[in-house]
Curated annotation (Swiss-Prot):
Organism: Bradyrhizobium sp. (strain ORS 278)
Name this protein carries in UniProt: Succinate--CoA ligase [ADP-forming] subunit beta
Residue positions binding substrate: N274, G331, I332, M333
Required cofactor(s): Mg(2+)
EC number of this enzyme: 6.2.1.5
Family listed: Belongs to the succinate/malate CoA ligase beta subunit family.
InterPro entries in the cross-refs: ATP-grasp, ATP-grasp_succ-CoA_synth-type, ATP_grasp_subdomain_1, SUCC_ACL_C, Succ_CoA_ligase-like_bsu, Succinyl-CoA_synth-like
NCBIfam families: PRK00696.1, sucCoAbeta
Pathway: Carbohydrate metabolism; tricarboxylic acid cycle; succinate from succinyl-CoA (ligase route): step 1/1
GO annotation, biological process: succinyl-CoA metabolic process; tricarboxylic acid cycle
Length: 398
């Protein structure tokens, strides 16, 4: 689960992390009061969407002006103008895709007198089962570009959760950022604060880009991006309360109601599979035969008929789907339950695209019988390779 920048900063501030003062704004008429509360003389008006690259992004609407999604204002009148232009407009960035995202919230923040910009992030390193720090002197830019062009400027190290963050970790951050004296002490303190927030809130990723040194000699978090481990949200109702469903894919929201593992993709072949490994293999073989999957969908091992029907309806709700591949290897998940769910869903919503079904495992004969006697126009497949070839051929009109 992701949250907005202003929410991330408020959360980090609870752990003592230094941030600039700011006020979230949902209506243009509230911008004036927000700016006056902060005092100025310089304000930063920031679009709040779940995507990076906001500063270099462009709005679709001409009425939003030709500036990006993060704007510097030198008067309250300018703050008000930017708020009117940006709220409700569609911002396109390198991470939103061509459709962009509508800006429904702004964050008006005190301007900072910046001397240096750095990069600092924490994430879960699944290979080592530790929390990894990624640190670079190259802040304010895409860290992927830095990794590609000048990888020597990125320093990484891990913290063992059994011992937690220690003094030498903070010193490692200060050294990587080439800080000394009081700034080094600030970096050591910040390292502990960020780690404590990361662990306490069960974050999956915490990215500070940029972390700045002001001309007054203070470290400050200028932008923050936070993702949480969805499996731990039941422990954090205060985090769940921050969720903004308008920033999420409607199909993914619907899938979460049925505890389905669903991720929308950009392809045209919808997939319904049981098991994450088999789902990834199914997506790979679709790509092998020259097409792209429209989604990742794992119905899990104990799905009911109703859950399977819901999954099928979510797939068919995607207008980009031109064909559907159901690939089930029945263990705990029984093939007849899958068949009943698919038949029920098709009878309810109709079937306007080719459907290939490959069933194997528990109750496979009963599952195949249910589908064959349903009267539906379903293409059966004997194995995964056969299934992939059939759905690709059907979608291409072969």
């Amino acid at each position: 689960m992701n949250i907005h920048e202003y929410q991330a900063k408020a959360l980090l501030h609870e752990f003592g992390v230094p941030i600039s003062k700011g006020v979230p704004v949902l209506r243009p008429e509230d911008a004036d009061a927000a700016a006056k509360t902060l005092g100025g003389p310089v304000w930063v008006v920031k679009s709040q969407i779940h995507a990076g690259g906001r500063g270099k992004g462009k709005f679709k609407e001409a009425s939003a002006g030709d500036k990006g999604g993060v704007r510097l204002a030198k008067s309250i009148d300018e703050v008000n103008t930017f708020a009117r232009q940006m709220l409700g407009a569609t911002l396109v960035t390198v991470q939103t895709g061509p459709d962009g995202k509508q800006v429904n919230r702004l964050y008006i923040e005190d301007g900072s007198d910046i001397d240096k910009e750095f990069y600092l992030s924490l994430l879960v390193d699944r290979e080592t089962s530790k929390v990894a720090f990624v640190v670079s002197t190259e802040g304010g830019v895409n860290i992927e570009d830095v990794a590609h062009e000048t990888p020597e400027k990125i320093v990484t190290f891990s913290v063992d959760p059994a011992t937690g963050v220690m003094g030498h970790h903070g010193r490692a951050v200060a050294k990587a950022l080439k800080l000394s004296g009081d700034l080094a002490k600030q970096a050591e303190k910040l390292t502990t604060q960020l780690y404590n927030a990361f662990v306490a809130k069960d974050m999956a990723m915490l990215e500070i880009n940029p972390l700045v040194v002001t001309k007054q000699g203070q470290l400050r978090v200028l932008d923050a991006k936070v993702s949480f481990d969805s499996n731990a949200l039941f422990k954090h109702p205060e985090v769940v309360a921050l969720r903004d469903e308008t920033e999420e894919d409607a199909k993914e929201i619907e899938a979460s109601k049925y505890d389905l593992n669903y991720v929308a993709l950009d392809g045209t072949i919808g997939c319904m599979v049981n098991g994450a490994g088999l789902a990834m293999a199914t997506m790979d073989i679709i790509k092998l035969y020259g097409m792209e999957p429209a989604n990742f969908l794992d119905v899990g091992g104990g799905a009911s008929k109703e859950k399977v029907a819901a999954a099928f309806k979510i797939i068919t709700a995607d207008p980009n789907v031109k064909g559907i591949l159901v690939n089930i290897f029945g263990g705990i998940m029984k093939c007849d339950v899958i068949a009943e769910g698919v038949v029920a869903a098709v009878k309810e919503v109709g079937l306007k695209v080719p459907l290939v079904v490959r069933l194997e495992g528990t109750n496979v004969d009963l599952g195949k019988k249910i589908i064959s006697e349903s009267g539906l126009n379903v293409l059966p497949a004997d194995n995964l390779d056969d299934a992939a070839q059939k759905i690709v051929k059907a979608v291409k009109g072969g």
